[in-house]
Regions:
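Boundary regions of SH3-family modules and the immediately adjacent low-complexity/disordered segments
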Residues: 628-636, 680-696
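Active-site SXXK
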Residues: 131, 135, 430-456, 472, ...
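Beta-lactamase-like hydrolase cores
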Residues: 384-429, 621, 625
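Extracellular glycan-binding segments that recognize GlcNAc-based cell-wall polysaccharides
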Residues: 76-386
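Short, well-structured active-site flanking segments
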Residues: 140-145, 340, 447-466, 542-543
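Short, Gly/Ser/Thr-enriched beta-strand-loop segments that form substrate-interacting elements
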Residues: 560-616, 620-627
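Mid-domain, small-residue-enriched loop/turn segments at the edges of structured enzyme/sensor domains
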Residues: 408, 481-540
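SH3/SH3-like beta-barrel superfamily modules
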Residues: 660-691
């Protein structure tokens, strides 16, 4: 079957019909089977926020005479056939293990009798799917995701079932190659629509409408706002358009597209940061009645727009706004079936939205993978009801893990996302924090550098803050900690800690000889968890100095506690500690952990000779609660560092040379004395300059 290929020119340039591009696709952001933000992350942390999509490439169109049309296609093109009406899916969930499979499930559920037209978008891209949702809405067509070079057997089977007269491949020049187009053309004629920018893509979708509308819902370049505009257009018989609304004037191409719809009213969907007041004024000057709907909270905003549906909906599509492909599918389904779409947390239904759905007598259709949208959403369980249950479940699981070990545990876990789950056991019990107390000293010194009252070259005693701050966290050096406490004073550091809300944290008095570590310092896991929570949220220091302290914690070398209880590759920033007390060896650790859907902080202090592996087990339990079970946890080499060059080995810090450590050798660091690290190298235990070592 020969594909009908259409190239849409860049704005202002003539176009030409030609085969689809065969060059390799430009890399775009992708999601693994279990999505991760990026991480962009992203990536809200707050839930990890949606990563900023990579701008799409601009294909160059060379003006040429119109090509000859093959004889077999010489007749006048027919008007697009009306689409088959979509139905509201009967089930509570459109899940599946991948976005490709999820789109197929949505197609089967909403278009059981087939479809005249099918819209396909590159499912490895992050921008095209949402823009394609608008086209699917305007053509009353299902939306499927494919890869640039071909289609899976599942998608092929669904296309055969739908039996479309036309498949529309909607994307940039790089979104489809020759193999992908040929695979589609083997099923039905392909209409290839290419675009070079978000506004252009949206105008093309708008122009595909065959019926006039009274109202156009206009959004800026934010994809979530555009998806909400698509949904609102579907429930109110309007149309949606995405524009570059940051400027002060409206492009002529945009005005022409709006005028072709026959609309007299425009509703701006989003704040002035997306569509400026000057831009809205330009629309009014062109003769449109302009109003605006906006809210800084995407969950509240989606509810606000869903309330505009004229009738009590049969169902609400619920999606996680952090998963762009589910946002696209939700918008397409919403518009096709005339049912509103709402955004919600991944753990439960946003409480105010739950109340509205309950009042309407409607049901929920969850669109998303279970790990990114839990079943409590399908049940319309309000977060106010789900949060206590989740907190109790986490506490029970942590207690069960702790019960496997002798000793006494104190711990606090706080989720940093929207729900802010929190649980603790003996979280307010004052205990010796061991080396975790160094976080307070590091903060106090960095705050002075940030404020300009000290510099990186300031020497509390014999070593600069540049060196002291690094080794105090990286290798848990006690000497630099003592130096900073002597410099600032234990009473002042206590006041600083308590000014941060650490009401149960205080330093003892620095002895004339000996370390502050044994001076009777006290803190709680509640205080320590609250400290790193504020650090991660940027509430303690400027972004620059927040990053510096967090990087120290991320790169510290004693990672056999919390860091060894989470999956490989998961970001953690931690500060462990250990101290001999009367009941035996105290073990502690406090960490920030960033998972795929949210982040959490955890602080643990265990007494009575508890092994480090117990802290790893508690971290694993917490991680599993938030993100699901996983296989082997991360492991770190006993020899944490590697020499970068030949360096003298010494009998003591700065002492006599007893040999040479060659470059490129792995070594185990056991302790530190300011710039000097004590290492095990083979059978030798010696001291070397830490600047000759790097993390493995």
């Amino acid at each position: 079957m020969v594909a009908a290929l259409v190239v849409v020119p860049v704005d202002g340039a003539a176009g030409q019909s030609r085969p689809a591009a065969v060059e390799q696709p430009t890399p775009t952001a992708t999601a693994s089977p279990t999505p991760t933000p990026t991480p962009t992350p992203t990536a809200t942390a707050t839930p990890s926020p949606t990563p900023t999509p990579t701008p799409t490439p601009t294909p160059t169109a060379t003006p040429t005479p119109a090509p000859e049309v093959p004889e077999a296609d010489s007749e006048e093109p027919e008007e697009p056939a009306p689409g088959v009406s979509a139905v509201v899916p009967t089930g509570p969930r459109l899940g599946g293990n991948s976005r490709f499979g999820r789109a197929v499930l949505a197609s089967r559920a909403a278009f059981p009798d087939g479809a005249t037209t099918v819209i396909v978008a590159n499912g490895d891209a992050t921008v095209g799917p949402v823009l394609a949702a608008s086209l699917a809405a305007d053509r009353s067509a299902p939306l499927l995701f494919v890869r640039a070079d071909g289609i899976s057997s599942t998608v092929r089977t669904e296309l055969m079932r739908l039996a479309p007269k036309t498949i529309v491949a909607f994307g940039t020049d790089a979104d489809f190659d020759r193999g992908g187009i040929d695979a589609l053309a083997a099923i039905a004629p392909v209409e290839r629509i290419m675009f070079s920018s978000r506004p252009q893509a949206s105008r093309l979708a708008l122009d595909s409408r065959s019926e006039p509308v009274d109202t156009v819902y206009l959004s800026g370049s934010d994809l979530r706002s555009h998806a909400l505009a698509i949904s609102l257009a579907g429930t109110t018989s309007g149309a949606a358009l995405l524009v570059n609304g940051k400027g002060s004037s409206v492009a002529s191409l945009t005005l022409e597209a709006l005028q072709r719809t026959g609309a007299t009213s425009i509703v701006v969907v989003g704040g002035t940061s997306e569509v400026s007041s000057a831009y809205a004024d330009g629309l009014e000057a062109a003769g449109f009645a302009v109003s605006r709907r906006s809210h800084s909270d995407p969950l509240e905003f989606s509810l606000q727009l869903a309330r505009l549906a004229p009738d009590a909906p049969e169902a609400f599509y619920a999606v996680n706004p952090d998963v762009v492909w589910d946002v696209a599918l939700g918008a397409a389904l919403s518009a096709a079936t005339g049912q509103p779409m709402v955004f919600t947390l991944y753990q439960c239904m946003f409480s105010r939205t739950s109340d509205h759905i309950e009042a309407q007598g409607s049901r929920v259709i969850g669109v998303g993978k279970i790990s990114w949208l839990r079943t409590a959403v399908d049940d319309n369980t309000a977060c106010r009801d789900e949060k206590p249950r989740l907190q109790a479940s986490l506490l029970s699981a942590l207690k069960q893990t702790a019960s496997k070990y002798d000793g006494t545990f104190s711990f606090t876990v706080i989720e940093l996302g929207r729900l802010q789950e929190r649980t603790a056991l003996r979280g307010s019990t004052r205990l010796d924090p061991a080396s975790m107390m160094k976080l307070v000293a590091a903060y106090a010194a960095l705050k002075r550098i940030q404020d300009g009252t000290s510099t990186w070259n300031t020497k509390p005693r014999s070593t600069t803050l540049r060196t002291c701050l690094r080794v105090m966290i990286h290798a848990s050096d006690n000497h630099c900690h003592d130096d900073i406490v002597a410099w600032l004073g234990s009473a002042r550091l206590t006041r600083i800690a308590q000014s941060l809300g650490m009401s149960n944290t205080f330093y003892g008095s620095l002895p004339a000889s000996g370390s502050i570590l044994y001076a009777g310092n006290r803190s709680t896991t509640n205080d320590l968890a609250a400290f790193v929570r504020k650090l991660e949220r940027g509430e303690l220091l400027s972004p620059k100095y927040t990053r510096i302290l967090r990087d120290y914690m991320h790169s510290q070398i004693f990672r056999t506690r919390i860091a060894s209880g989470i999956p490989p590759g998961v970001y953690q920033a931690s500060k462990p500690g250990a101290l001999w007390i009367s009941s035996g060896l105290l073990q502690g650790d406090t960490a920030i952990v960033r998972g795929p859907q949210t982040s959490f902080v955890i602080s643990i202090i265990a007494t009575g000779g508890v092994p480090k592996s117990a802290l790893s087990a508690l971290a694993r339990t917490a991680y599993t609660h938030f993100f699901g079970s996983f296989g082997s946890a991360a492991s770190y080499p006993l020899q944490q560092m590697r020499s970068t060059r030949s360096t003298p080995m010494r009998s003591s810090p700065g002492g006599a040379v007893v040999g040479t450590l060659p470059g490129g050798r792995n070594v185990e660091v056991t302790t530190a004395s300011r710039v000097w690290y004590k290492i095990r190298y083979g059978s030798q235990v010696v001291w070397v300059d830490s600047r000759a070592l790097r993390n493995r």
